[in-house]
UniProtKB/Swiss-Prot annotation:
The gene is nanM. GO terms for cellular component: periplasmic space. This is N-acetylneuraminate epimerase. It comes from Haemophilus influenzae (strain ATCC 51907 / DSM 11121 / KW20 / Rd). Homodimer. Its EC number is 5.1.3.24. It is an enzyme of class 5 (isomerase). Disulfide bonds: none annotated.
Length: 375
């Protein structure tokens, strides 16, 4: 038995290592989960979410750099906004915030940050869809946004909940009605949206040939788009993955294999996973789900996560030749942070871990096709 364990450990650590000598990045000044960010040149911008109305920057090319706070975001505190960078400027869209009545509401406003003079400007536009649970990435002179919750349905749920006051029975009735629906009845966004800053125009880039998502990992590299998992209704994720390609006829999509299950576990899909590219390899890690929810849904339970506990994850997956495999594990569970590809590494910034605790850590992972390195 001891020989078997030793052999297994040797094989495991031959595939991934923890590097003590590589460049390390300073922790965030505050834990940021449910926030957003973008990379402009060598500078990364991260903020909002549990960071309140603050944004912070870090010069990645300077080994001695520390996080710096920039001008306060003028749109107020909000969770799950979308951000991307175009032409050296940072764009922030939507999110979830409380109104004057204390109701959580989806907002569809837009802001631009100019690093050259450290100023924000509210843009004269509104997103055509709710952008909570949406994922964004830039390509050329546009920001592309995938998925998201339905503004009217989501806002209505929170309005009804606040209106119920302290009436627990009424609140339970509202929650039961909200969660006891089919995925398609939540009307998650099923179009790929784009926003072009130079014209201040939104565009419908076509329907996605798969179910609407919230909290999907969404990455654009060159002309390829990758979508990994996400919620298909509140509390229920999918293990599906998809790949798109920009063509003269628009984005052409194809299905990829489902994300595999870790050994001895079920694969209930992930929301809030982090992703990026290292040495040409696509990596995705972390995320959260409700183990057993897909099984309950297949048994006919629409409230698929009822009675289940939320779990955070640490597996690192890579996509190679159209197939997924697990190449290692992070030292901690993580989800709902910000990830960015930089210098052949994927930086995992902030996020949350078990129980929803906000993280200040900045980790870097890299993969060369044989070995996963975690810094």
């Amino acid at each position: 038995m001891k020989l078997t364990k030793t052999a297994l450990c040797t094989a495991l650590f031959a595939t991934f290592t923890f590097s003590a000598n590589a460049q390390t990045y300073p922790d965030l000044p505050v834990g940021i989960k449910g926030g957003t960010g973008a990379l402009i040149g060598d500078t990364v911008y991260v903020g909002l979410g549990s960071g309140g109305d603050k944004f912070y920057t870090l010069d990645l090319k300077d080994p001695s750099a520390q996080w710096k706070e920039i001008a306060t975001f003028p749109g107020g505190e909000r969770n799950q906004p979308v951000a991307a960078a175009v032409d050296g400027k940072l764009y922030v869209f939507g999110g979830l915030q409380k109104n004057e009545k204390g109701e959580l509401q989806l907002v569809n406003d837009a802001y631009r940050y100019n690093p050259s003079d450290n100023t924000w400007m509210k843009l004269p536009t509104r997103s055509p869809r709710g952008l909570v649970g949406s994922s964004g990435a830039s390509h050329g002179d546009k920001v592309y946004i995938l998925g998201g919750s339905n503004l009217s349905i989501f806002n209505g749920f929170f309005q009804d909940t606040v209106a119920a006051g302290e009436d627990k029975a009424k609140k339970d009735e509202i929650a039961a009605a909200y969660f006891d629906q089919r995925p398609e009845d939540y009307f998650f966004t099923t179009e790929l949206l784009s926003y072009e800053p130079s014209t201040n125009k939104w565009r419908n880039e076509g329907r996605i040939p798969f179910s609407g998502r919230a909290g999907a990992a969404f990455t654009i590299q060159g002309n390829e788009l990758v979508v990994v998992n996400g919620e298909i209704k509140p509390g229920l994720r999918t293990a599906e993955t998809h790949q798109g390609k920009f063509t003269a006829k628009g984005v052409q999509w194809k299905n990829l294999p489902d994300l595999p299950a870790p050994k001895g576990k079920s694969q209930d899909g992930l929301a809030g996973a982090l992703s990026g590219y290292s040495n040409g390899h696509y990596l995705v890690t972390g995320g959260a789900n409700f183990p057993g929810s897909i099984k309950q849904f297949k048994e006919g339970k629409l409230h698929a996560h009822k009675g289940l506990s939320k779990a955070w994850h640490n597996e690192v997956y890579t996509l190679n030749n159209g197939k997924w495999r697990i190449v290692g594990e992070l030292p901690m569970n993580i989800g709902y942070g910000f990830s960015v590809s930089y210098n052949n590494k994927v930086l995992l910034i902030g996020g949350e871990t078990d129980g929803g605790k906000a993280l200040t850590s900045v980790k870097a992972i890299s993969y060369d096709g044989k070995k996963l390195t975690i810094e």
